[in-house]
Amino acid sequence: MSKKISGGSVVEMQGDEMTRIIWELIKEKLIFPYVELDLHSYDLGIENRDATNDQVTKDAAEAIKKYNVGVKCATITPDEKRVEEFKLKQMWKSPNGTIRNILGGTVFREAIICKNIPRLVSGWVKPIIIGRHAYGDQYRATDFVVPGPGKVEITYTPSDGTQKVTYLVHNFEEGGGVAMGMYNQDKSIEDFAHSSFQMALSKGWPLYLSTKNTILKKYDGRFKDIFQEIYDKQYKSQFEARKIWYEHRLIDDMVAQAMKSEGGFIWACKNYDGDVQSDSVAQGYGSLGMMTSVLVCPDGKTVEAEAAHGTVTRHYRMYQKGQETSTNPIASIFAWTRGLAHRAKLDNNKELAFFANALEEVSVETIEAGFMTKDLAACIKGLPNVQRSDYLNTFEFMDKLGENLKIKLAQAKL
């Protein structure tokens, strides 16, 4: 390449442990040699979050709001052991949760598929992107044990002082049981719908919303009605122009359809369904090391991309002792490519779009040519059968990717 590609503004968030080391290698070997970025860096490593009382996480989220593109390295969410290990002031919340609460939006998870990595569901030849509505329902419910006979009722008290409305949930006549009250808000469901429609348009894939509205006629019916209304008013013509579609499906029918399908669609799930199905689908594709996670905000302009896995602590402990590691960087690389691709789309930057796509192609082609990390070799051969000659270590694999990217870009005369 004769000159670097002008990449525009990107918010970059550094992370923890082995993924932090990989993150620096990605920048050094795959991004910075080719792209000139107006980079806004925030250190979300656990020590710096503690030193700033987690203000750095909030600052990073505000920066993403301002510049519309964020790329994030995996971070530690501390438990008691981590509080002790790092002598933290307190058990800081998940940075992902903090960022999501500030930005809003929906998290979409997508598998990165290589032909030579076996899938548990062999028919899935294209990704299934799961969008989880990460608000309300069971996760913000009030539940309790009913100690004995009696009535459980739910009451709505209007703010304007008009008549209260009370609903009988159940009349416990023979002993106690359990009860729960849960909720969601129209605004949150609307945001979820917009993010889902935006994602479908950006991928050019159909969108399905799954609920159980035959049983929860009012509750799940509200999700169905809001999605349909927004689709008809704002997205239907765009979908038809792209020859894609939106459909509501019952959750049980949708699960069966997904198993039989070849993939290649967006699946919008309510909170609990998304929690369960995203892990189920991830496992079906074979490896969490090959799973991207993108937060899409309802404005369709603001996106934050990251790997769907953790900080790979076990490998970091080996690295600290000077032992060889073979850590898969692919999901972290795709956090960068998805962020850069979105920047390219916002700025109509064709060179940057080509670069992001080329780096994704190189990542997949390198693995399909037989150069991979140990976790992927284990997917193919089974861990007990893996020899050292079957895989590259962390640094060898990054070098191989760098070498192949250089060749691809030279061939493209970019």
From Swiss-Prot:
Cofactor mode of binding and number, as noted: Binds 1 Mg(2+) or Mn(2+) ion per subunit.
GO MF annotations, alphabetized: isocitrate dehydrogenase (NADP+) activity; magnesium ion binding; NAD binding; protein homodimerization activity
Modified residues (Phosphoserine): S389
Sites bearing N6-succinyllysine, chain numbering: K126, K400
Subcellular location: Cytoplasm, Cytosol
Keywords: Acetylation, Cytoplasm, Glyoxylate bypass, Magnesium, Manganese, Metal-binding, NADP, Oxidoreductase, Phosphoprotein, Tricarboxylic acid cycle
GO terms classed as biological process: 2-oxoglutarate metabolic process; glutathione metabolic process; glyoxylate cycle; isocitrate metabolic process; NADPH regeneration; regulation of phospholipid biosynthetic process; regulation of phospholipid catabolic process; response to oxidative stress
PTM annotation: Acetylation at Lys-374 dramatically reduces catalytic activity.
Modified residues (N-acetylserine): S2
Protein name, UniProt field: Isocitrate dehydrogenase [NADP] cytoplasmic
Recorded name of the encoding gene: IDH1
